[in-house]
Regions:
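Cytosolic covalent-transfer regions centered on His/Cys nucleophiles
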Residues: 1-183
Length: 183
């Protein structure tokens, strides 16, 4: 849809501020959509109907990153991610985590997504959604924006709920794109 901004009279300062923030949000939305297009593909999203423990899950996801050419050293990457989780957990909110390695860099940036129908316990949280990130050494604006987006996901209860209800990878991608940072 098209965003509409209505005014009855000449704009006041607060109208101009609102309009500017709306334009900023639309630009952010476009940028976020572009980043999601680039980094989160359907074939890298897996819905797990059964219980999984974190180490087993991360190993499986690391192998997929390796098969897709994002990382070359599966074992090194996996152990690095586990170590990070032990010392600096990457929980965002109570249901989501974004594990990534401390020292091991990716050949190219890639993301594996796991949506669990049965939660697992991690640092006192019941986790259901895992975005495993393989990051190149050069951190760019896109990744910073992606982290901002992840932070926003967890603060939108309705949106988060919708994501967690996704039945399969198609539904997950569709729900992922239903975000509006405007709300």
């Amino acid at each position: 849809g098209v965003e509409v901004f209505s005014m009855d009279k000449l704009p006041e300062i607060k109208d101009i501020e609102r309009l500017n923030s709306m334009i900023h949000m639309i630009r952010m939305n476009k940028r976020v959509s572009k980043i999601l297009d680039c980094y989160i593909q359907k074939e890298h999203v897996k819905v797990y109907p059964d219980t999984k423990e974190l180490p087993e899950l991360l190993l499986e996801m690391s192998k997929k990153l390796h098969e897709s050419g994002f990382i070359s050293d599966t074992k090194g990457f996996y152990e690095d991610v586990l170590l990070r989780e032990k010392n600096y957990p990457t929980n965002l909110g109570s249901q989501m985590m974004v594990p990534h390695a401390l020292f091991t860099f990716a050949d190219k940036t890639g993301i594996e997504v796991a949506l669990l129908k049965k939660t697992f316990e991690h640092h006192g949280n019941q986790v259901q959604l895992v975005f495993l990130l393989a990051l190149e050494k050069k951190r760019n604006d896109e990744m910073n924006l992606l982290f901002q987006f992840f932070n926003q996901i967890v603060s939108h209860k309705k949106y988060m709920h919708q994501l967690l209800q996704s039945e399969d990878s198609d539904a997950f991608i569709k729900n992922l794109y239903s975000f509006k940072l405007l709300e």
